[in-house]
Curated annotation (Swiss-Prot):
Probably deamidates glutamine residues to glutamate on methyl-accepting chemotaxis receptors (MCPs), playing an important role in chemotaxis. The gene is cheD. One of its GO terms (molecular function) is protein-glutamine glutaminase activity. This is Probable chemoreceptor glutamine deamidase CheD. It comes from the Archaea. The keyword Hydrolase applies. Belongs to the CheD family. The lineage of its organism: Archaea, Methanobacteriati, Methanobacteriota, Thermococci, Thermococcales. Keywords: Chemotaxis, Hydrolase.
Length: 162
């Protein structure tokens, strides 16, 4: 099965078969969208919450808000229906201890913005594994819409399928 790897501040979409994956989700978030009927899906690996807050600099996929809009547009182009899409959300970890500043709680903010934007777009969030301190790797199976998540927390490897 072909695997497409998504880097930080990037996304990929596909249809039918294959795996779309992203590695090393720390404070970043990985958002998957999937239409079970057409078997169209996509994955976004966003670094920061809102483009406007950073002066819309650079690639829109770097930000949760603009990246999600981009991902939505691309899965619809491949045949997905916005009304059937299901979202899954991963990442948003607090990677450093002793951070008190709200400004530096990027992981938490990424998760909040992702949930807000999904609500605004009318897309159902059906699964999530967010927060904590460990990094995550996720694999979206385009034939089923299932996401296999692997994380390391306190030296333990945890794998789950969502």
């Amino acid at each position: 099965m072909k695997e497409v790897k998504v880097g930080i501040g990037d996304y990929a979409v596909g249809k039918g078969n294959g795996i779309i994956s992203t590695y090393g989700l720390g404070s970043c978030v990985g958002i998957t969208l999937y239409d079970r009927v057409t078997k169209v899906g996509g994955l976004l690996h966003a670094l920061l919450p809102e483009a406007a807050r950073y002066g819309h600099r650079g690639n829109p996929a770097k930000y949760v808000d603009t990246g999600l809009q981009l991902l939505l547009k691309e899965v619809i182009k491949l045949g997905a229906s916005k009304f059937r899409l299901e979202a899954k959300l991963f990442g948003g970890a607090q990677m450093f201890d002793n951070i008190r500043s709200e400004e530096l709680k990027i992981g938490e903010k990424n998760v909040q913005v992702a949930k807000r934007e999904l609500r605004k777009l009318g897309i159902r969030l059906v699964a999530e594994d967010t927060g904590g301190k460990g990094g995550r790797t996720i694999y979206l199976d385009l034939s089923t819409g299932k996401v296999r998540m692997r994380k390391v927390t306190e030296g333990k490897v945890i794998e789950k399928v969502y």
